[in-house]
A protein has these predicted regions:
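Conserved phosphate-binding elements of NTP-dependent enzyme cores
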Residues: 1-960
């Protein structure tokens, strides 16, 4: 029987989700399909809100009736029909986890295999002496005793307690009940008497004497029985005490250090897990860092006295116990609360911070009591810690955090594991050392490790190594060679998280699945793009359909099929303007194809700005992989920070420069990474980081509230005659307070349906039908429109509507100028893409008056942006620079890099191979320098007619 058309295709009929205009789309199965178009044109509506949503709905229909009870409010996508749909997996750009315990190794499950490798094939060493641990069979122990102690009188001891406090009365009773009469306590042989107990506040070593005998070969049978009994009592460990010289020697069926007597449990995978009590460092509980008091934050000015507020957590003096306690401490050092902190003896300060061992006397005259009284004083550090750990809520924890800093755990030095787990070595390396290697370095190490192993360990490790190598290879293939397994998931970008999930999916070897990816090229240098594309093709070649929402030129040209959504964004989009092969697309006149074939382009400026003559200079930056770099930022220019993924761009800008500026201007508590100094701050008056994070966390936030124009709109409505007659105040037109809002949905416009084991779902309020306000409020109208009608307008409509209201027009016109004319004034921030959120923030900054001395920092602002969106964005950034400001952009996109005035190129590689400053200067200079990978790609981009020639070659090769 021949295959029908739908067997070969996924067919979508009549899709009307969001702005989609009843579109029909055919996607060939088992192919790599790219969906492209302007930001807001409807790409995600088609890929995620239609295809993925319908796939999820069909999956949920397979649940039991009980499980489906929780899902009744999930609406089916507004689409007539979808045929040929496979099981769907969505791989979106979002941070993998906010859990500080989650790492690249745990997310990919590679660390699980590493733990298994160490449990089965690693060798144990003593964390005391560094010597290799040993373990023996009972027969071997008997033979060793016969050899070493022939003719000697010995005691066979079973260790019960090693260096622990307690009186051990119950333990001695148990020993006596078992029939043992002699014990060895702290090296002294003693009779186990009734009621025997020790000093409970001292550490003790306790062994029970199981047998006393003279070692003779003819009595080997008795020795064998005694050794077996001793090992049983000692949990697999025993000691032999030579009566002649009082020397002891350890023997064990477990892993043991004969010199120190420490023994390890038989290793299991959980012993190497920092999320397990058996493996985690006891100091930091497996986090790798601890919170400690920051002296500089607690004592910001040591010239002040404690009474004047010299201790920031306490503030100025008040009649409270903590001040009485400190006053009593200082009195012992002939000081008082009026003494400047810098003049206090170090010993006194130490007691103020850390407390004192003995009880503290509070004099009657200090406490205003009739008699002196005594208290335990734990010190200021403990006081802050108690507030951090208290049940008083987030406010008290935030209060405590402002006086603390995070530092590497002093016990495990960031390895997260206890000393026993860290004492195992595989091919000479601890598990932490392997986890800290770059993926590329780890892959090379494991590739060559088998030749270093003996035959026994090689046989054990072979299959585990094979699995490890396979999974590491998938990470290499998606351009993540610079990451390490120990890298916290919290620090990964959205693009990195997505590529990790992509690598995991390739490793799962699933077939006949529909994968939908959201811009997997985010954060990826041009150099690594080919590897990513090959990974997607590998996923396709397994027998899957791969649908990618993407703007990257290389990805589009490498696709089997392209769907272009447009022609513009918002209400002006939602149509399929092209679907077919890339070669066919290049010969059309869509906006996308014009940028691909060179008919349109983001023009290279004729001249580059030199700046205002002032330079911000960062000296000796050495955080993460930075190698003591010194970087110049010419003020009054557009600066591009470039380099391969993991080369140190974000470390330099987001983790060093931005926190320095934020601390200087806003007293931010965020600490910058290590650097020597910064010069030129006097030429800057503020810093603004414009990122792609949501405008708010709930549906309440929107462009109108974020930009501040909503306050002006409410003021306009309050001053209308109808509002004045009714006595309405500005709060009447707020959906956040009682009075004018709909009380059924509390002004949300939606009701939240808790989905238990799924994310919450928002459904329109049945009372106000999503308008947020009550009936009375909506009766107040301006030019025939209620305030709810205004919030429902697009920016373009609002610009026309408020053309005669200057203070409102100014703010919304800027939103139109940055290309957001299609979004609604009251559109929930949760529905805006990252690129749209960023442009709302940019518009807000543009609408403000500035002094022309502001630094704007943007991290990959082209995420989610089409070529035309990038052109609009760059026009906005150029406007900011033309006003005298400085714009610093971390970017891989060559359209941004080529229009910058000044480039800072980091590299040469990612991870440990990066962190160097390769070049700083003009784009032309980098292109001609021959340094690094960015210059090579930039040179081709700056070559006239490069795009047109590349397009002609592509079309000709596909027409043959």
């Amino acid at each position: 029987m021949s295959e029908t058309k739908s067997d070969n295709n996924i067919e979508i009929y009549g899709a009307r989700v969001h702005n989609l205009k009843n579109v029909d789309v055919t996607l060939p199965r088992h192919s790599l399909c790219v969906i492209t178009g302007l930001s807001g044109s409807g790409k995600s509506s088609l890929a995620f809100d239609t295809l993925y949503a319908e796939g999820q709905r069909r999956y949920i229909e397979t649940f039991s009736a009980y499980a489906r009870n929780f899902l009744d409010n999930l609406e089916r996508p507004d689409v007539d029909k979808i045929t040929g749909l496979s099981p769907v997996i969505s791989i979106e750009q979002k941070t993998t986890s906010k859990n500080p315990r989650s790492t690249v190794g745990t997310v990919t499950e590679i660390y699980d295999f590493l733990r298994l490798l160490y449990a089965r094939a690693a060798e144990a060493y003593s964390y005391v002496t560094g010597e290799k641990m040993v373990k023996y069979t009972e027969e071997r122990i008997v033979d060793m005793i016969l050899t070493a102690y022939e003719g000697h009188k010995v005691y066979l001891l079973a260790p019960l307690v090693r260096s622990r406090k307690g009186h051990y009365k119950e333990l001695f009773e148990t020993v006596r009940r078992k029939g043992f009469l002699t014990v060895r306590v702290d090296g002294e042989l003693r009779e186990a008497t009734p009621g025997m107990r020790l000093d409970r506040y001292k550490n003790h070593d306790i062994e029970v004497v199981v047998d006393k005998l003279t070692v003779k070969a003819k009595d080997a049978e008795r020795l064998h029985k005694s050794v077996a009994q001793t090992l049983q009592q000692g949990g697999g460990v025993m000691m032999v005490l030579d009566a002649a010289d009082n020397q002891t020697r350890f023997f064990s069926k477990q892993l043991m250090d004969p010199a120190s007597g420490i023994a390890y449990r038989e290793p299991a995978p959980h012993n190497f897990s920092f999320n397990s009590a058996q493996g985690a460092c006891p100091k930091c509980k497996g986090l790798g860092y601890v919170s400690v008091m920051d002296h500089d934050k607690v004592v910001p000015d040591d010239k002040l006295s404690i009474r004047e507020g010299g201790l920031a957590p306490l503030g100025k003096y008040r009649n409270a116990l903590i001040f009485w306690e400190i006053q009593s401490v200082l009195a012992d050092y002939d000081c008082d609360l009026k003494t400047p902190i810098c003049d206090l003896p170090p010993e006194a300060l130490d007691e103020v911070f850390n407390g004192r061992a003995d009880r503290l006397r509070i004099p009657a005259q200090v406490a205003h009591t009739t008699d002196d009284y005594y208290v335990e004083f734990d010190g200021l550090v403990k006081y802050i810690q108690q507030m951090a750990d208290s049940d008083m809520g987030a406010a008290s924890q935030r209060w405590a955090e402002q006086f603390s800093k995070t530092t590497v755990c002093p016990e495990c030095h960031g390895a997260r594991l206890n000393k026993e787990a860290m004492a195992y070595r595989f091919a000479g390396k601890t598990i932490a050392e392997l986890s800290n290697m770059d993926i590329a370095e780890l892959y090379d190490f494991l590739s060559n490790v088998e030749i270093q192993l003996d035959s026994k360990h090689r046989a054990i490790a072979h299959e585990i190594l094979k699995e490890l190598m396979s999974r590491l290879k998938f990470l290499l293939d998606v351009g993540l060679d610079y990451l390490s397994l120990s890298r916290s998931s919290m620090t990964l970008s959205g693009g990195e998280s997505q590529r990790i999930r992509l690598a995991t999916q390739i490793g799962s070897q699933l077939v006949n699945v529909l994968y939908i990816l959201d811009e997997p090229s985010i954060g990826l240098h041009q150099r690594d793009n080919v590897r990513l594309i090959n990974s997607l093709k590998e996923l396709r070649d397994l027998g899957n359909t791969v649908v990618v929402v993407e703007h990257d030129k290389d990805m589009m040209l490498a696709a089997d099929y392209v769907v272009d959504i447009g022609p513009r964004a918002g209400r002006l989009g939602g149509e399929v303007v092209f679907e077919g092969t890339p070669a066919q697309m290049l010969q059309t006149q869509t906006l996308t194809s014009q940028y691909l074939n060179g008919r349109r382009a983001i023009e290279v400026p004729a001249t580059r700005r030199k700046g205002n003559g002032h330079v911000l200079r960062l000296v000796g930056a050495r955080g993460n992989n930075l190698k003591g770099v010194t970087v110049n930022f010419p003020l009054g220019t557009l600066i591009g920070v470039t380099g391969v993924s993991g080369s140190g761009k974000s470390t330099l800008i987001n983790d060093t420069l931005l926190p320095i500026l934020s601390q200087h201007f806003y007293r931010s508590l965020r600490e910058p990474l290590a650097y020597d100094r910064i010069e030129g701050l006097e030429h800057v008056d503020k810093v603004v980081a414009v990122d792609q994070s949501p405008l708010g966390r709930t549906p309440r936030s929107n462009p109108a509230t974020y930009t501040g124009v909503f306050s002006d709109i409410r003021s306009l409505y309050v001053n209308l005659p109808e509002a004045k007659i009714r006595g309405y105040k500005p709060g009447r037109f707020s959906f956040n307070v009682r009075g004018g809002r709909c009380e059924v949905c509390k002004g949300n416009g939606y009701k939240t349906i808790e989905m238990n084991f799924l994310p919450d779902v928002y459904v329109p309020c049945e009372a106000c039908h999503g308008k947020r306000y009550n009936h009375e409020t909506l009766e107040v109208r301006f030019k025939g429109k209620s305030i709810a009608d205004v919030l429902d307008m697009t920016i373009n409509q609002a610009v026309e509507f408020f053309e005669n209201v200057p203070n409102i027009l100014h703010k919304i016109k800027v939103l139109q100028d940055v290309g957001l004319g299609y979004i609604k004034l009251g559109q929930s921030s949760t529905t805006l893409s990252g690129g749209e959120s960023q442009r709302v923030k940019l518009a807000t900054e543009l609408s403000k008056r500035d002094t022309g001395q502001t630094i704007y920092i943007l991290d990959e602002p082209t995420t989610g942006l089409h070529f035309e969106d990038i052109r609009v964005l760059m026009d906005v950034l150029q406007r900011l620079v033309n006003r005298g400001n400085t714009v610093i952009v971390i970017e891989h996109n060559l359209d941004v890099i080529k229009v910058a005035d000044y480039l800072i190129d980091m590299g040469p590689e990612g991870g440990r191979g990066g962190g160097q400053l390769l070049y700083e200067g003009t784009p032309e200079g980098l292109a001609e320098s021959g340094v690094g990978y960015t210059g090579k790609f930039l040179k081709a981009e700056l070559t006239p007619s490069h795009t047109a020639q590349q397009t002609d070659n592509f079309i000709n090769s596909n027409n043959k």
